[in-house]
Amino acid sequence: MSRTKGGTVTHRRHKKVIDAAKGYYGARSTNFRTATQAVDKANQYATRDRKNRKRQFRALWIQRINAAVRQHDEALTYSRFINGLAKAGIEVDRKVLADLAVHEPDAFSAIVDQAKAAL
């Protein structure tokens, strides 16, 4: 039985890494060893930032809700507003509240009034 050479397999593996590093600066886009390191690091960043994205969006929603609540009533804080929502039995998540605050201020004002009445 003849010996199997690994040239095509190695070439495919190298090509996959080099293709993933397309657009990187300098040798990182052409040199297999540095491209491998760059792609590995990029994947680490991507994995980490998929988790961070969720935190960042939640923080953004909270900031938007807080700003809209304070525009409506300066004495009311985000914390007291959320407490009022819970007491009023209004189950709307922060994403929807932030969207309402930005795109439909009248509907958001009605929710704020209900939450304030429940306090």
UniProtKB/Swiss-Prot annotation:
UniProt key word rRNA-binding? yes
Which terms does the record give in the GO molecular function aspect?
A: rRNA binding; structural constituent of ribosome
Per its UniProt record, what InterPro entries does this chain match? Answer: Ribosomal_bL20, RIBOSOMAL_L20_CS, Ribosomal_protein_bL20_C
Extract the signal peptide range. Answer: none
Record keyword Ribonucleoprotein present: yes
> Per its UniProt record, what PROSITE patterns does this chain match?
RIBOSOMAL_L20
One Gene Ontology cellular component:
ribonucleoprotein complex
Highest taxon, organism lineage: Bacteria
Q: Which Gene3D superfamilies match?
A: 6.10.160.10, Ribosomal protein L20 (1.10.1900.20)
The record ties this protein, via Pfam families, to:
Ribosomal_L20
Write the record's keywords in alphabetical order, separated by commas: Ribonucleoprotein, Ribosomal protein, RNA-binding, rRNA-binding
One annotated GO biological process? translation
Q: Which PANTHER family is this protein grouped with? A: 39S RIBOSOMAL PROTEIN L20
The UniProt function text for this chain reads: Binds directly to 23S ribosomal RNA and is necessary for the in vitro assembly process of the 50S ribosomal subunit. It is not involved in the protein synthesizing functions of that subunit.
Family designation: Belongs to the bacterial ribosomal protein bL20 family.
Quote the protein name from its UniProt record: Large ribosomal subunit protein bL20
Q: Which gene encodes it?
A: rplT
